[in-house]
A protein has these predicted regions:
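N-terminal amphipathic/basic-hydrophobic helices that include classical n-h-c signal peptides
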Residues: 1-35
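Conserved short alpha-helical segments that host acidic/polar catalytic motifs at enzyme active sites
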Residues: 28-173
């Protein structure tokens, strides 16, 4: 079965990465069905030579099941030397070949962690920051404000983060 994503075509805001855009926040409403269009994830990813890292949070086509996904690619040999492993209820990356691991700081992290009824999905080590601060009763937004772009000049990779709440068979994100 092909996985589809729903993109909000009128509200998507692309903010260039980098130090000059610190503090810019984008909040999207949960109920924007009128502004959304269904697109094929496979088609979207295959239309670019380097999709990089990405997260998907949403629901199946019939709206009955929650969907959370994370994907990565790597430009450097160090970035390509990683695999996903289960870690409790979450996922983390680890070196495929530890002898080839150079700098683990931007490639070894937990992109998915579960805190109670919340599944946190991100493209970097901010997953741990969000998890730890939410565990101390801070909000998702408060946790995000403690972090900035990745220190990988000249790219300054944006930190992408999402959260899904599941409660009594219902879910929102």
């Amino acid at each position: 079965a092909e996985l589809y994503i729903i993109m909000c075509v009128q509200t998507v805001l692309f903010i260039p990465a980098g130090p000059s855009n610190l503090g810019m926040q984008t909040t999207l409403s949960e109920n924007m069905e009128d502004d959304m269009e269904r697109v094929s994830l496979a088609k979207e990813l295959s239309s670019t030579t380097y999709p990089g890292r990405g997260i998907v949070i949403g629901r199946t086509k019939d709206g009955k099941k929650a969907v959370t996904a994370y994907f990565i690619m790597g430009r450097s040999e160090n970035s390509r030397n990683r695999v996903f492993v289960e870690d409790g209820e979450g996922i983390r990356t680890q070196a495929f070949d530890p002898s080839k691991l150079e700098d683990p700081s931007l490639i070894i992290y937990a992109p998915v962690r579960v805190l109670g009824n919340k599944t946190i999905v991100t493209n970097g080590d901010q997953t741990d920051t969000i998890y730890e601060l939410m565990d101390k009763q801070q909000t998702f937004e408060q946790a995000l404000r403690t972090r900035e772009f990745e220190p990988d000049a000249p790219n300054y990779t944006p930190r992408i983060s999402g959260i899904m709440h599941i409660d009594n068979g219902e879910f929102n994100y």
